[in-house]
Every structure is written in C-alpha cells, then in structure tokens.
C-alpha cells in the first residue's frame, strides 16, 4: 500500500516537473518571439524615420514665405522683446521652427532641435506599438501613415503629437513611479518649448494640460499633477530667460498673440474644394461620435485618447480649413491621419464593427487625399535623405570663412535695391513695408521693425494701432522703404489704415527705387506733427448699399467703418471661419472689388483717391490726391452671418 502511494507521489511530481518545464519552454519561446518582434518594429520604424527626415538646412532667399523666417532670426539676433517689440504668430523660440541658415548658432540650434523632435516622434510611435502589442497589420497601417504625413508635418505638431502619445500611454498603461515622474517633467518641458515656438501650440499644450489636471484630480494623483504643472510653468520661465526675454513682457505677448489668433479666421480665410471640407467635417463628426459612444458604453481608454487629442485636432482643423489652400489642408489631413491611425491601433478592441469600419474608411480617404495632393511622398528618396544629412554635417564642420562665404552668396541673391538707395540709407535705422525683410538682411541694414512686421498680419484695429504708435514713438526708424503689396486680392492701402495715416503725417518721400521692386524711399520728417482730425459726416447704412464718398480739397479723407458679426457669424468664426466680406471702389472710370477686413477699418480707411501703382502711391505721399472715388459698397455672399447695419464716420486730416 505504501509502495503504491509512493509511486503515485513520484508520478505526480514527474507530471508537475514536466508541466513546469513545458511552461518554461513556452514562456521562453514567447519572450523570444516578443523580443524579435520588438527588434523588428524598432528597425522598420527607424528606417521610416530616416526616409522621412526633414530638411535640416535651408538658405534664406527673397520671398514672402522666407521673409518672416528671416525676421524671426533677426529679431533673436537683435534681442527684441516679444509682446513689446515684436508681435507675431510665432514666439521667442520661433527661430527654431525651420532650420534656415541666417546665422550659424541659431541654425545649429534649430537644426539640432528639428532632428531631435523627429527622432522623438519616431520613438513615441515605436513605444506605442511595442507597449500595446500591435499586430503586423497595425504596423503596416502606421508605417503608411508616417510615410505620407511626416514629410510636411510641422515641427510643433510633431512635438505635440509625441507628447500626447507618451502621456496617453502613461495614463492607460502606467510606467513605474519614478520613470513616470521623469516622463512628466520631460513632456512638460517639451510642451513649454512648443508653446514658445508658436502661440497655437500653446493652445494645444493648454488642452493637454487641462486633460492631465482633470485626470490626476479624478485619480487623486496629486504628486503627478504638481509635477506636470510646476514643470511646465518652470520650463516656460527658464526658456524665456534663456532667450533673453523679460518676464514682465509675457502678459503682453499672450494678449497680443490672442488678438492675432482671434483675427486670423476673418483676415486670412480662403475657400477650397467642397470635397475637402466634407472630409474635414466627417473627421470631426466621427471623433465626436466616438466620444459619445465611449461615454455611453464606458470605454475609458477611448475617452482618454479623444480628450487628450481634442485640442490637437481642433487647432489642426482650423489651420487647414480657415486658409484652405493646398499646403494648409495637407497639414490638417496629415495630422488627422496620424490621430485616427493611432486611435484605431490603440483602441480598436473597444470599437464596434461599424465604428472600426468607419474609422478605416476615413483613414483611407485621408490617405487618398494626401496622395492625390502629393503623390511622390510615398516614394522613398534615399539619396536625397543622405544629401540632407550630408549638407547639414558639412556646414556644421566647415570653418567660419567657408560659412561666411556661403551666407554672403545667399545674401547677394537677395539684393534688389539700387546703389543710390543703399548709399542714402547708410547706417540709418530702416523698416520695410509691406514685408520684404530680406532686403534688410541681405544688405545688413540697421533694421528697426514695427511690432507686426508684416502688414497683412495686423488683422485687427488693435494690432494696427500697435504699429501706428510705434511710428509715433522715439524708436521710429529714420527711413522707410514702402512698396505696394498685399494678399488675397485685398486693397493694400486698407491693410493698416492707422499706420498709413501716421506715416503720411510723419514721413516725407525722397525718391523711388525702381531697380526690381518699386520702393518709395521715405524719410522721417524733421518735426513730428500732432494727430488732428475733423469729423465730416456720419452715415448709417446696410450691407450691399452704395455709400457716397464726400469730395474734399487740401486734406486727406478717411472713413471709420463699423460692422460686426451676429451670433451665427461669431459661432462660425470660432468653430470654422466666417464668409468673406468685399468692398467695391467706384470711380468715373473703374469699379474694382477687393477683399475687405472690416475689423481694421474701424481705424479709418483712406478714401482720398484710388491707388493702382507706385506712381499713384507717390502722389498720395506728396499730397497730390485726385478725389476720384465716387462711392464704396460693402457686400458679402452670406449676409445672414452679419449684422446688416453699418455705420460710416467720414473724417479729414491735414496733409
């Protein structure tokens, strides 16, 4: 009996040993497969990272697009204060937005940062795919999305997407406590950097922070909450100090940046294909539907993903569809593709079959639209990527003389002014209107910019007044180079009415430079005259009605025009964009229609005569006005978005 019992015990022990051995083998095999899979994911997406590496070296050139990049680099070199000396959609770290070689140290910083952000983006994707045990199909989908989206994705979106992915992973699959806190400090610093590159990035960062604050309070995680908030605020302060900014100017920077953002939808809107608008609305609609579904069905991970990415999607939507041209809509489609691909990969098990199919349909529609606009994006340019890296490394390792020669060559190509103009300017302070800052950079002029150094960016009456006040101050430049130029079929004299009035009062024409672009050279008057005006008449009218223009002699005529959105228009402006407004200028010979930015017109638009060329502009500066305008008419195709009543106050000022 005892022998049978002993035999049974040995048999049980052998069975247990065999099971343990089998389990160990299975575990070992599973670990090996997992390790191989992770290595393969890292390798494949590292290759994709190389194939989508951004341009790390651009040489400055003369154009509107490059002009503001040059301006931001020059502003950094001059130590100008953002919010006080400079008011622009970009902030104190705006020079890092695009690595143009305007000055070696700033280029090196921006190039290194651009490369770091790209690597961080790829790293966050790899971590996501590894941590969530993504399938091969998921990896293929994400790889395709990256190949199409990354080549044109802007640096602030790359950075913020990386941040929201890492934070999302920390929420649904927490790291160990210490690494988690280190991650929070790191992403807070990255959000602070993005916030100081571009103001809209601060809005996205704010939405991410709000989500994390609510989440930490809900989970009663006080230490992580404090870590995130204090790290973000501390990083902002440190970066402001490192960039030479005074903290006291930061509130003004926020206020003016908000004014720019608020005016953008009205001033810069452009309409594009209806099909692309429908895709954008479908993307937003599907995201809202997914949020409602996740709340009703208690799908916390899906709720977290949608909420943490909500600000990113909203800003991308506004970015792409307010100024709806091929480059801006590409950015929205690329960002939407990244968001929906990541959401599908991380949360497909929480979706119903219908929602999975709808998400996949949207993803492939986005892929189709991106591919249609830029079909070569999917074709790897291996040689080109090696050239990008090689040219950046070459410049970084060149001696100072070689770099100076390269920069001088770029500046030489920008120079379009006559020798007489350069001789006249000498070392006097100078500003350029409307935007060609490349001349100041190319000739090494003593640039003294107005706060909004691109006229078309003074979207509101308050921003226009900032420039006007600058030209009345002691800092006003000695010389102005004034050319005709604007955007979107606007009327250039209406872009900055208060600023124009101040220039007419305080500057005098000297001569015209006609070598390439036509510039009127203006000098500051010996004595600054006080601003005086006299009201002529006040007229209440309606949209679409002709407004007669008074005829006056010996003085300049201006008109303050007051119109506004109704509730529907304000809603459209907030969530999408309002319909454009137009102004028709009628003379005895011509009737011309221009896009009209009515928020600026509150400062008083110039109506003494119509202006078509540089000679007409010179006549205005000389006081030789023709009083040829008979009437103006303000109209829109969609008056339902506006209060129909308009008030016009005509006033005159001395020549």
Predicted regions span which residues?
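Short hydrophobic/aromatic helix or loop-helix immediately within or flanking a transmembrane segment
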Residues: 71-74, 78-108, 194, 205
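Short hydrophobic alpha-helices at membrane interfaces in multi-pass membrane enzymes
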Residues: 136-142, 162-192, 222-231, 299-310
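Membrane-lumen/periplasm interface segments of specific transmembrane helices
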Residues: 225-267, 316, 372-373
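Transmembrane-helix motifs of polytopic, lipid-linked glycan transferases
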Residues: 112-142
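Perimembrane helix-loop-helix junctions
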Residues: 204-234, 295, 338-351
């Amino acid at each position: 009996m005892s022998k049978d019992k002993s035999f049974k015990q040995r048999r049980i022990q052998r069975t247990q040993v065999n099971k343990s051995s089998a389990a160990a083998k299975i575990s070992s095999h599973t670990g090996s497969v997992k390790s191989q899979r992770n290595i393969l994911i890292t390798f494949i997406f590292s290759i994709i990272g190389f194939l989508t590496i951004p341009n790390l070296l651009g040489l400055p050139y003369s154009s509107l697009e490059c002009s503001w990049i040059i301006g931001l680099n020059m502003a950094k070199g001059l130590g100008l204060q953002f919010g006080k000396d400079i008011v622009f959609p970009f902030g104190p770290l705006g020079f890092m937005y695009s690595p143009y070689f305007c000055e070696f140290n700033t280029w090196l910083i921006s190039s290194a940062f651009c490369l770091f952000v790209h690597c961080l983006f790829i790293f966050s994707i790899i971590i996501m795919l590894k941590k969530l045990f993504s399938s091969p199909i998921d990896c293929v989908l994400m790889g395709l999305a990256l190949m199409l989206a990354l080549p044109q994705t802007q640096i602030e979106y790359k950075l913020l997407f990386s941040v929201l992915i890492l934070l999302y992973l920390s929420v649904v699959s927490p790291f160990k406590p210490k690494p988690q806190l280190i991650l929070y400090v790191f992403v807070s610093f990255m959000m602070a950097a993005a916030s100081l590159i571009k103001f809209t990035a601060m809005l996205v960062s704010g939405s991410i922070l709000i989500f994390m604050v609510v989440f930490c309070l809900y989970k009663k995680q006080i230490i992580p909450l404090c870590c995130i908030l204090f790290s973000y605020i501390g990083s902002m302060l440190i970066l402001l100090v490192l960039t030479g900014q005074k903290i006291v100017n930061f509130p003004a920077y926020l206020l003016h940046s908000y004014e720019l953002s608020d005016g953008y939808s009205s001033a810069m809107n452009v309409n594009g294909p209806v099909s692309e608008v429908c895709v954008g609305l479908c993307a937003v609609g599907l995201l809202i539907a997914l949020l409602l579904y996740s709340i009703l069905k208690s799908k916390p991970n899906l709720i977290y993903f949608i909420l943490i990415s909500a600000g990113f999607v909203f800003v991308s939507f506004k970015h792409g569809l307010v100024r709806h041209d091929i480059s801006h809509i590409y950015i929205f489609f690329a960002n939407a593709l990244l968001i929906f691909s990541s959401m599908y990969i991380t949360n497909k098990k929480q979706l119903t079959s219908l929602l999975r199919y709808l998400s996949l349909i949207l993803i492939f529609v986005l892929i189709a639209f991106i591919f249609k606009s830029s079909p070569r994006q999917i074709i790897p340019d291996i040689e080109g990527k090696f050239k990008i890296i090689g040219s950046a490394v070459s410049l970084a390792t060149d001696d100072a003389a070689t770099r100076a020669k390269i920069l001088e060559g770029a500046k030489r190509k920008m120079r379009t002014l006559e020798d007489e103009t350069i001789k006249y300017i000498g070392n006097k302070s100078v500003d350029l209107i409307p935007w060609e800052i490349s001349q100041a950079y190319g000739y090494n002029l003593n640039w003294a910019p107005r706060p909004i150094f691109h006229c078309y960016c003074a979207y509101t009456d308050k921003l226009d007044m900032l420039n006007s006040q600058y030209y009345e101050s002691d800092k006003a430049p000695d010389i102005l180079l004034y050319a005709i130029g604007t955007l979107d079929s606007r009327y250039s004299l209406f872009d900055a009415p208060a600023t124009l009035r101040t220039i007419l009062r305080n500057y005098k024409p000297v001569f015209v430079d006609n070598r390439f672009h036509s510039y009127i050279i203006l000098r500051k008057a010996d004595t600054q005259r006080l601003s005086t005006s006299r009201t002529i008449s006040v007229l209440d009218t309606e949209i679409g009605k002709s407004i007669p223009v008074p005829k006056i002699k010996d003085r300049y005529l201006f008109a303050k025009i007051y119109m506004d959105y109704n509730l529907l228009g304000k809603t459209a402006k907030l969530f999408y964009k309002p319909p454009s407004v137009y102004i028709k200028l009628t003379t005895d010979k011509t009737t011309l229609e221009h896009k009209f930015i009515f928020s600026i017109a509150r400062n008083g638009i110039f109506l003494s005569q119509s202006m078509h060329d540089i000679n007409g502009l010179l006549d205005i500066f000389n006081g030789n006005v023709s009083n040829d305008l008979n009437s103006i008419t303000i109209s829109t195709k969609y008056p339902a978005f506006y209060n129909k009543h308009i008030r016009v106050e005509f006033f005159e000022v001395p020549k």
